[in-house]
Amino acid sequence: YTGYLTFSIKPSGLKAADAPVRLKFTFAEVPSELNTPLEPYKGGLARSWVQDEIVTIMSVPHEMTIPRRLAGRYLKIELLGISSSFDFVFDKLTFKAQTSVTNEAPALASTTDPLVRDIYEVGLNTLKECMQTVYEDGPKRDRRLWIGDLYLEALANAYTFKNHELTKYCLYLLAAFAN
């Protein structure tokens, strides 16, 4: 999923918080990704693209939406700092998915092989996740518009979701930087 995480915390006892609460949220596509250390980072893209976020909450109770759009199917929450005399609980945890897709994709024929149907559904979900403000190469990666991704995703979109405005917008963006 690609979108925004909202959560709220509240005290679990009678004592008031005498220090901030610091949490780290890590998003992953597969469970094993959550156990892979991020540091020291050796990737080719900037470290800031990695799907993790550290937040410091100054007072409890508190509700917040992480302002950065994130992507993943799994979430790990780590407690990085808290007063030893205070404890809290999550009161609410929601993830609001986001996409530019507004139309339903056409259904396959009822006689379609189940394996082909499964592949079609995975492809639709992947395309939907990559259709954001532009056709992205992947919501977890760099979120840049690449001409190869535009070509493939626009072709798939033409037969499925038919969001032609997104295709037109991406073409205008690329045309603006032609020279």
Language model feature labels by segment:
Residues G123, E153, L174:
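Conserved hydrophobic/aromatic pocket- or pore-lining residues that grip, position, or stack substrates
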Residues K162-L166, A178-N179:
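Proline-centered turn/helix-capping motifs that create local helix->coil transitions or kinks
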Residues Y1-D137, D149, E165-C170:
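Extracellular/oxidizing-compartment recognition motifs
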Residues R141-D149, K162:
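Aromatic- and histidine-enriched alpha-helix N-cap/loop-to-helix transition segments
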Residues M131-D142, F177-N179:
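Glycine- and aromatic-rich loop/turn segments at beta-sheet edges
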Residues L152-N163:
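Well-ordered alpha-helical scaffold segments within catalytic/enzyme domains
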Residues L171-F177:
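Membrane-interface coil-to-helix junctions
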